Amino acid sequence: MKLTCVMIVAVLLLTACQLITADDSRGTQKHRSLRSTTKVSKSTSCMEAGSYCGSTTRICCGYCAYFGKKCIDYPSN
């Protein structure tokens, strides 16, 4: 019985703390998420076939050939 009361009080305190901090942080988000069109345009930014793909941060539209370090398109079926 004593343990149950302690657990109930702990849950109530944690819930109250979350509600208080949620109210305080309303409207103070610094970095808002990107719009879906921006996400799509960034996700489709890749290097074309024939481009060097050694130590770049961008990825190939197809795949990077290991020995030639060139981007190659996927074969069409």
UniProtKB/Swiss-Prot annotation:
Keywords from the named record: Calcium channel impairing toxin, Disulfide bond, Ion channel impairing toxin, Knottin, Neurotoxin, Presynaptic neurotoxin, Secreted, Signal, Toxin, Voltage-gated calcium channel impairing toxin
S-S bonds: 46-61, 53-64, 60-71
Endpoints of the signal sequence: 1-22
Keyword flag Nucleus: no
Tissue: Expressed by the venom duct.
Propeptide part(s) removed at maturation, as residue ranges: 23-42
Gene Ontology terms for molecular function: calcium channel regulator activity; ion channel inhibitor activity; toxin activity
GO cellular component entries: extracellular region; host cell presynaptic membrane
Protein localization: Secreted
UniProt remark on domains: The presence of a 'disulfide through disulfide knot' structurally defines this protein as a knottin.
Family membership noted in the UniProt record: Belongs to the conotoxin O1 superfamily.
Function: Omega-conotoxins act at presynaptic membranes, they bind and block voltage-gated calcium channels (Cav).
The protein, known as: Omega-conotoxin-like SO-5
Highest classification ranks of the organism: Eukaryota, Metazoa, Spiralia, Lophotrochozoa, Mollusca
Gene: SO5
